[in-house]
Amino acid sequence: MEHEYQRAVTRVCVQTALLLLQHGAESTVVVQMAQRLGVALGVESVECALTANAVVLTTLSDNHCITTARKNTDKGINMQMVTDVQRIVIAVEHHLYELEIAQRKLDQLKPLKYNRWLVVFMIGLSCAAFAHLSSGDWIICGITIFMLKLLYDMLFAAIPAVGFALVFNVPPKALKYCAILAALGHVTRTLLLHINMPIVFATFFATCVIGFLGVHLSHRYLAHPKAFTVAAIIPMIPGVHAYKAMISMVQIHHFGFSDALFEQMISSFINTSFILGAIVFGLALPGLLFYRQKPVV
């Protein structure tokens, strides 16, 4: 391999890693995408090291190494950029793009930004939906009373999912799937709670539904699963329990210690921790089953 070509491959690989890291991709995804792109372009191997503010990448070809480093500046979560970069890497792997085309495509990428007023409106509407999901009255929520329980449960889970998907700059075509996954996940948890399943297990199974559907959609639309799943799990975040724990701590500090306040604080904190744990494991399970390269044991 010619030295100049390897240098060009190194530059495009580090640019790929930098774009992914800047816009909120996981470190594992960043490293894997850079390695896959380099191998697809003909180098023997790619080594990538990430720090909080830099990317260091080395390509190896014909016993010749080239190392480069780039400073990382966080540009906020933008799943549109992550998805577009992944599609470019996949296109190179399928021999649809050569080095020059891949470089040009990466240079042409622009972060998706939704209209700020639309984001503000959807976040406000999302907060109203959270109020309803937390047993707020109809005046606060400002919605119709004629919907069936499960239908408006799905609706009020879908609204905040879309609102936060806009915050995360999810690709426009993925917005409807974020809403659908949020609706299906939350209504699954509601049904499981209705049959007296503990909220931790209900949340875990509901998050698994979102996770598996997210993996399916990622294969179908060549996007990262988190483009569909991260916003969808937002309605199940235990904000009320966390708020109660915080308020109890403030009251203990202000009014002094009491058994009732301490019990409420510990109970709310434990509920928050276990529900968050259920969400994390439920969302990680599909990845462990479908993407892991080595056996767990």
UniProtKB/Swiss-Prot annotation:
Pfam families in alphabetical order: ThrE, ThrE_2
Keyword Membrane: yes
Designated name of the protein: Uncharacterized protein HI_0108
Transmembrane regions listed in the UniProt entry: 114-136, 150-170, 197-217, 227-247, 269-289
Membrane topology: Multi-pass membrane protein
PANTHER family documented for this protein: SUCCINATE TRANSPORTER SUBUNIT YJJB-RELATED (PTHR34390:SF1), UPF0442 PROTEIN YJJB-RELATED (PTHR34390)
Superkingdom classification of source: Bacteria
GO MF annotation list: transmembrane transporter activity
Keyword set, alphabetical order: Cell inner membrane, Cell membrane, Membrane, Transmembrane, Transmembrane helix
A single BP term in Gene Ontology: succinate transport
Recorded family membership: Belongs to the ThrE exporter (TC 2.A.79) family.
GO cellular component: plasma membrane
Record localization: Cell inner membrane
